[in-house]
UniProtKB/Swiss-Prot annotation:
Gene3D superfamilies: Phosphatidylinositol 3-kinase Catalytic Subunit, Chain A, domain 1 (3.10.20.90). It is found in: Preautophagosomal structure membrane. Residues 1-57 are annotated as: Disordered. Pfam families: APG12. Residues 8-26 have a biased composition (Polar residues). Belongs to the ATG12 family. It comes from Neosartorya fischeri (strain ATCC 1020 / DSM 3700 / CBS 544.65 / FGSC A1164 / JCM 1740 / NRRL 181 / WB 181). PANTHER family: AUTOPHAGY PROTEIN 12, UBIQUITIN-LIKE PROTEIN ATG12. CDD domains: Ubl_ATG12 (cd01612). Forms a conjugate with atg5. The gene is atg12. There is a cross-link at residue 174 (Glycyl lysine isopeptide (Gly-Lys) (interchain with K-163 in atg5)). Its main location: membrane. This is Ubiquitin-like protein ATG12. It is a peripheral membrane protein.
Length: 174
C-alpha cells in the first residue's frame, strides 16, 4: 500500500478536485484557481441583460407625503423654480481674440431651450460652414454641455441678468 506523502495526503495517485495541488511555482498562501467546466457554453458570449425599468412618473405635490407637508416657503420656491424655465432669458455673446464680432451681441431665448440651440444660433449668425468649429464658454470659465438648459445656466451663472457666452473659432481654454 502507498503511504501518504506531503504532496498527496490522501494516499492515492489520482488528483483530488476538491483539494488544490501545490506546485513549486505556486505559492502556498495563494488560493489555487479552480478549473471547472462551464455548464452552458453560450453564457460566455451573451451580454448581461439590461434591467427593464419603467420611467418614473412625475408625482404631484398632493400625492406626495413629503411634499404635502412642506412649509409655504418651500412651495413658493418650487413654483419659482418651475416658472424660471417658462420665460425668456437674455444672452450676450462676447467674442474672444481672433473670433469674428457680431453686429448685435444681445439676444433673447426661451429659458426652456437647450444650450445646443444657442450654439446653432451663433453658428448661423457667424455664417459658419459645417466643418467650422465654434467653442462657447459661459463667463469665460467653462464650456457647458449641449444638453444643459439655458434657464438653469442663466439662473446659476447670470451677470447683470444676462448669460454671458464667450465664443471662439479655436479652443481658448484648457
Amino acid at each position: 500500500m502507498d503511504s501518504p506523502s506531503p504532496e498527496n495526503p490522501s494516499g492515492t495517485n489520482s488528483p483530488n478536485p476538491k483539494s488544490p495541488q501545490i506546485t513549486g511555482s505556486r505559492l502556498s498562501h495563494r488560493p489555487a484557481i479552480s478549473q471547472r467546466p462551464d455548464l452552458d457554453s453560450n453564457t460566455r458570449s451573451t451580454p448581461i441583460p439590461d434591467d427593464e425599468h419603467g420611467a418614473d412618473l412625475p408625482m404631484t405635490m398632493s400625492a406626495s407625503v413629503v411634499l404635502s407637508s412642506l412649509p409655504r416657503d418651500a412651495h413658493r420656491a418650487l413654483a419659482d423654480a418651475e416658472a424660471v424655465d417658462t420665460g425668456k432669458v437674455t444672452v450676450r455673446f462676447q467674442p474672444l481674440p481672433s473670433a469674428p464680432i457680431l453686429k448685435n451681441r444681445v439676444f433673447k431665448i426661451s429659458a426652456s431651450q437647450k444650450f445646443e440651440t444657442v450654439v446653432k444660433f451663433l453658428r448661423k449668425k457667424l455664417d459658419c460652414k459645417d466643418t467650422d468649429s465654434v467653442f462657447c464658454y459661459v463667463n469665460s470659465v467653462f464650456a457647458p454641455g449641449l444638453d444643459e438648459g439655458v434657464g438653469g445656466l442663466w439662473r446659476c451663472f447670470k451677470t447683470d441678468d444676462q448669460l454671458i457666452v464667450s465664443y471662439s473659432m479655436t479652443p481658448a481654454f484648457g
